[in-house]
Amino acid sequence: MKRHILATVIASLVAAPAMALAAGNNILSVHILDQQTGKPAPGVEVVLEQKKDNGWTQLNTGHTDQDGRIKALWPEKAAAPGDYRVIFKTGQYFESKKLDTFFPEIPVEFHISKTNEHYHVPLLLSQYGYSTYRGS
């Protein structure tokens, strides 16, 4: 029994830094807080797109965790300067709470100029409004 507990502890100590490192190397993260409840918004789909010519190309998608975060949204490829957007698909989040919303999708466009920096896009959300900014 003691060996099993010790093995579990050692495995978690080895895995945690590796996961943190993977998220730490990723240049893009998002976070959603529900302003009406003051709590994170888990399970929200977020789509990352890159502007190409006259349209948008999907690069990645993910769902927020229990803390309302996606710590590593950038796909496993090199980042390039350019125009991008994240689309927060909030309609299902409010529908699951049996609430109406005026914004079923919230696209947030941003520009990446330096690929060696981290970009964090927080979303403060309510049924009829939202706010965002470049976080850290």
Curated annotation (Swiss-Prot):
Signal sequence bounds: 1-22
Impact noted for substituting H120A: Reduces activity by 90%
EC number(s) recorded for this UniProt protein: 3.5.2.17
GO molecular function terms attached to this record: hydroxyisourate hydrolase activity
PROSITE patterns on file: TRANSTHYRETIN_1, TRANSTHYRETIN_2
UniProt key word Thylakoid: no
Keywords: Hydrolase, Periplasm, Purine metabolism, Signal
Gene3D superfamilies named among the record's database cross-references: Transthyretin/hydroxyisourate hydrolase domain (2.60.40.180)
Annotated disulfide bonds: none
One Pfam family matching this protein: Transthyretin
GO BP annotations listed: purine nucleobase metabolic process
Keyword Signal: yes
Residues reported to bind substrate: H31, R69, Y133
Catalysed reactions listed for this entry: 5-hydroxyisourate + H2O = 5-hydroxy-2-oxo-4-ureido-2,5-dihydro-1H-imidazole-5-carboxylate + H(+)
Cross-referenced InterPro entries: Hydroxyisourate_hydrolase, Thyroxine_BS, Transthyretin/HIU_hydrolase, Transthyretin/HIU_hydrolase_d, Transthyretin/HIU_hydrolase_sf, Transthyretin_CS
SMART domains (alphabetical): TR_THY (SM00095)
Its biological purpose: Catalyzes the hydrolysis of 5-hydroxyisourate (HIU) to 2-oxo-4-hydroxy-4-carboxy-5-ureidoimidazoline (OHCU).
Subunit structure as annotated in this protein's UniProt entry: Homotetramer.
Family: Belongs to the transthyretin family. 5-hydroxyisourate hydrolase subfamily.
Name this polypeptide is given: 5-hydroxyisourate hydrolase
Species of the source: Salmonella dublin
